[in-house]
């Protein structure tokens, strides 16, 4: 009986979601493109969002979220105004809303999500490709972080805020456009002439990523063409690594290992590529692939692999 009730509940939720997707439509047809015409609200921007540091496991949170517009300073609304298609700015046609956000207003988002069962024991990172301009983020009503800046990606470790089953994600955004403290471009609250319509709220992919406690957070790769060398600097996600851990980098040419190097945490890895280096140019679109797994030394465990991959462009 319990299983029947659970199956019925799941069917109802699926039915509601299907109906909601079927009801979505663009708000007008401004600046319509062939890609916009083919947009599937159930599969929005499915491409991996960080091609320069790719991991196999991730979960896309793009799609229909609930939204509300409220005066600045108010608490989270008990009821929301409707649905918005993330990651399109609320002013855009593809958001399904297409309204202007005043500098005296805040834009609220919320949705439910579940963490895949296979991620048990991992740290879970919540990524935003970009949110314009100031974003406050909560998971299950727990404040997980704040970010300012409309163009830079950011992420928060939300592991400690998660619960079993469904989780609630809430985002509050304030975007004063040309009336705020941020550097001003050509977006304007009253667009005309050369002044553009503002781009407010979430406007790049939102996604989840499982990582080990010891993981690579970011990488910087500097080529030295004269010496046929790459310098790789990695920033790790933990301030204290277990003893014996180090970073190892491998460079591949169409799947074939051509060079490798290693260094302890905090030090750069210098890798010399043997033979004639294949340089990238507009005429020869060659790309080396660089993989950075975690390695172990002696008997000390390092807690699994970091599993990071990056494309290396060596320009002529």
What are these model-derived regions, one by one?
Residues 13-14:
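Repetitive helical segments and hydrophobic/amphipathic motifs
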Residues 2-5, 9, 20-316:
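Secreted/periplasmic carbohydrate-active enzymes, especially glycoside hydrolases
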């Amino acid at each position: 009986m319990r299983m029947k009730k659970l199956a019925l509940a799941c069917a109802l939720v699926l039915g509601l979601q299907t109906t909601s997707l079927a009801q979505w439509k663009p708000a007008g047809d401004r600046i319509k493109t062939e890609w916009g015409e083919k947009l599937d609200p159930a599969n929005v921007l499915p491409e991996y969002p960080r091609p320069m540091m790719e991991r196999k496991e991730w979960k896309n949170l793009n799609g229909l979220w609930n939204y509300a517009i409220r005066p600045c300073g108010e608490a989270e609304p008990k009821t929301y105004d409707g649905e918005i298609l993330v990651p399109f700015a609320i002013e855009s046609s593809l958001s399904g809303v297409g309204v202007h956000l005043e500098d005296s207003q805040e834009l609220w988002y919320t949705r439910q999500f579940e963490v895949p069962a296979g991620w048990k024991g991992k740290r879970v990172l919540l990524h935003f490709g970009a949110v314009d301009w100031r974003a406050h983020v909560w998971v299950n009503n727990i404040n997980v972080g704040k970010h300012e800046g409309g163009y830079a990606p950011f992420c928060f470790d939300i592991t400690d805020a998660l619960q079993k089953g469904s989780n609630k994600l809430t985002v509050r955004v304030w975007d004063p456009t040309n009336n705020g403290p941020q550097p001003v471009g050509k977006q304007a609250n009253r667009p005309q002439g050369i002044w553009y319509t503002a781009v407010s709220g979430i406007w790049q992919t939102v996604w989840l990523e499982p990582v080990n406690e010891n993981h690579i957070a970011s990488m910087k790769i500097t080529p030295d063409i004269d010496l046929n060398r790459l310098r790789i600097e990695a920033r790790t996600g933990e301030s204290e690594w277990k003893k014996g851990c180090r970073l190892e980098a491998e460079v591949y040419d169409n799947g074939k290992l051509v060079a490798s190097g290693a260094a302890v945490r905090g030090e750069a890895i210098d890798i010399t590529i043997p033979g004639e280096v294949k340089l990238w140019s507009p005429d020869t679109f060659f790309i080396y692939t660089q993989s950075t797994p975690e390695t172990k030394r002696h008997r000390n465990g390092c807690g699994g692999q970091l599993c990071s991959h990056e494309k290396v462009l060596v320009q002529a």
